Amino acid sequence: MDELVISSHGNIESAKEFINSLEKSQFTFCLVISYTETSEIPGITIAGADKEFLKFTSPADAEFLRHGHCKCIDSIPMSPDGKPTPALLTKVALDSAKIPHFVVNAGSKISPDTSHFDSQLEFGKNISESKALSPEKISEAVEFGKIIGRSISQPNQCLIIGESIPGGTTTALAVLKGFGINTSVSSSMPKNPIEIKNQTVSNALKRLKSDDPINVISELGDPMIPVVAGILSESSKITRVILAGGTQMTAVLAFAKRIGYNKQNTAIGCTSYILDDGDAKFLETVKQIDDIPVISVNPLLSESKFAGLRSYSEGFVKEGAGAGGCMIASLLKSRMTSEKLLELIEKEYQRISALKSN
């Protein structure tokens, strides 16, 4: 393992023990795709080239992981100036270490053109205007997640769970605040539109009449959070679980703590760019929720010859589609160097750039 690239945070000893326990594990990745109409608030996210494309972002990520190209749109999900989806990093990590994956549709507006588990959930509503989903639907989402968790988890395996949901940091912020956790959040942009997010959250919090966990997610969240929390709740009883992501996974963790999970088997895995985000106070947020390991990976994108990849280290995108957790698993399983991983990422970037221009 490259000690300079994979780092332990929070409870350092616990994080190192968790990493050591993974050395001989088999990894499986679960990508949970979803949608919240909160993402359609102008200026709140960079995920997707424009409002009309937002609904395609998550299914396109799922298709890209499976096929190497997207079917619901003509290119891969990119920002207006061509910064690539973090699913590029995820795909390279999975392919290079031969890590299998599956997709869960947890309320995506568009169903992906690839095999997947379908929750039959509706997408989340704009939380500044109404509750995301009914309490009954949140309970159904949790139970669906638990079924997935029981079905796919095996001892001596590590399950990595990632998400793809535009605007998800805003619903995550609302959920954290709803649970009384004092925090800020990360963003897909270097200048975090925190005023827009805070106003959105403030509008949503006015409706909150109960701190019952199901009610908090119903009023303030999105469909991804209860599904992933359900998966974590059951999977962590059986095997190690890495919540692969940033702010959204802290919201999952906060909800999971209230419905039950095994923290001894749980860690958060993310890119170092989440921890570099001064606005997010990520480690402090995790510490407020529970004492679990945080593991980060630096994919050395600041050294890339491509501006689109370097942008990750400059504050754009930072994380998503389970990229950080998958790169951690890939490096542990394949024993490749970080330089080799960067070389493979650049090779894939060149390939998809050619797809985009055709």
Predicted feature residues:
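N-terminal loops that bind phosphate or other acidic moieties
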Residues: 1-162, 169-358
